[in-house]
């Protein structure tokens, strides 16, 4: 089991779902400092309390942050290094969903310009701004193992026509990750990507706004061959990629859960 003792991590979208699960697991593995950012501060206190129970030694710093702002992302990453003197790893989990459901055919005619821009702004631009800022601060730190993990989605592979913006943003996230990985590998920074399948997070019901319950959503996806996974499973893959145990791996996009072949 990889140890994260004495290490400093930054997690976007860290207050709920996969991001929160990643923060909790990093603390369980002994992380010294976890700096999490999220657009909503609602869960900050409860997550800090949860982490304190599992590992009182882990320092948790929460920042309200909109990853659509490149300047604010830069400031956040710079403040982490200024305060803690290092940044060993980062996971860019922040993202938003797109409601599917039944729409008229062809669905591209119903793709809303504002929704298209909003989703790509968070899911693609936010990942780009975050990864760029992380590379910027990491490259000037002393030599050592440094790793960045971005979160794409099963939607990058499934070609579902009623979530154009979401699928496009996640496909682009995966492509961006592999390009950055090749670019910064010789700087001692590994960059990888995970693509979760259907995952039980607070975002899941947003994909199916017409469903009456979470169980209905799970049953629907199961009937399509996609059983619903849990955030902890994705977090374990992210933490492995952040750890030295995964040092041979860079530029990968790892499917987690039920995904198309």
Curated annotation (Swiss-Prot):
Gene3D superfamilies: NAD(P)-binding Rossmann-like Domain (3.40.50.720)
Binding site for NADP(+): 18, 66, 132, 166, 170, 201
One example GO MF annotation: oxidoreductase activity
Active site (record annotation): 166, 170
Enzyme kind, highest EC tier: oxidoreductase
Pfam families membership: adh_short_C2
Domain of life: Eukaryota
Carbohydrate attachment residues: 43
Signal sequence region: 1-20
Pathway(s) annotated for this protein in UniProt: Alkaloid biosynthesis; ergot alkaloid biosynthesis
Reactions catalysed, as given in the entry: chanoclavine-I + NAD(+) = chanoclavine-I aldehyde + NADH + H(+)
CDD domains: SDR_c (cd05233)
BP-aspect Gene Ontology terms: indole alkaloid biosynthetic process
Enzyme Commission no: 1.1.1.332
Keywords linked to the UniProt accession: Alkaloid metabolism, Glycoprotein, NADP, Oxidoreductase, Signal
Keyword RNA-binding on entry: no
Protein family per UniProt: Belongs to the short-chain dehydrogenases/reductases (SDR) family.
Cited PANTHER family: 3-OXOACYL-(ACYL-CARRIER-PROTEIN) REDUCTASE (AFU_ORTHOLOGUE AFUA_6G11210) (PTHR43180), DEHYDROGENASE_REDUCTASE FAMILY PROTEIN, PUTATIVE (AFU_ORTHOLOGUE AFUA_6G03520)-RELATED (PTHR43180:SF63)
Complex formation: Homotetramer.
Function according to Swiss-Prot or TrEMBL: Chanoclavine-I dehydrogenase; part of the gene cluster that mediates the biosynthesis of fungal ergot alkaloid. DmaW catalyzes the first step of ergot alkaloid biosynthesis by condensing dimethylallyl diphosphate (DMAP) and tryptophan to form 4-dimethylallyl-L-tryptophan. The second step is catalyzed by the methyltransferase easF that methylates 4-dimethylallyl-L-tryptophan in the presence of S-adenosyl-L-methionine, resulting in the formation of 4-dimethylallyl-L-abrine.
Protein's name according to its UniProt entry: Chanoclavine-I dehydrogenase easD
Organism of this sequence: Claviceps purpurea (strain 20.1)
